[in-house]
Amino acid sequence: MTGLALNCEIAPQTKFDRKNYFYPDLPKGYQISQYDMPICKNGYLDIKLDNGDTKRIRITRIHMEEDTGKLVHVKGKTLVDYNRAGVPLMELVTEPDINSSEEAKKFCQELQLILRYLDVSAANMEKGQMRCEVNISLSKNEKLGTKVEIKNLNSFKSVERSIEYEIKRQTEALDNKQEIIQETR
């Protein structure tokens, strides 16, 4: 239902694979994922901006995979919460059409409304039922810059603030002729 609501092509066939990697929040050492053959692809969601314009955000893919554990940093120690490990999740990936924190926030808000309307998910960000990971890359020309990923944002405000901060950080670095390092924050 989500794929249809987001104007996606629905795959007639899909498969799940093991995605092997070591990370402390992945106790099995692999994750089950539809990454190679997503259930949905080539969709879009139109969002209404504050100035009244409508912008189309293209959706590359929607696929199912297992959630991982959660790293919790407390008093100089890192703990791992495995309560959500193995729980199925839907991952949605967009094309690089989002150009501002406002557009990202509007996209997430509209997606949340659709998921709730379809009764696919309560999509409560504060409960971890919907999380956002943003990739920010700035460039002085048409070529995409080096991306920095910010993971597990759990509110519209954190999406907005994280993007604004990262745009400012990368702008200052580029203005000072510093290299942007690809990283996850």
Feature locations, PLM:
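Basic, nucleic-acid-interacting segments
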Residues: 1-185
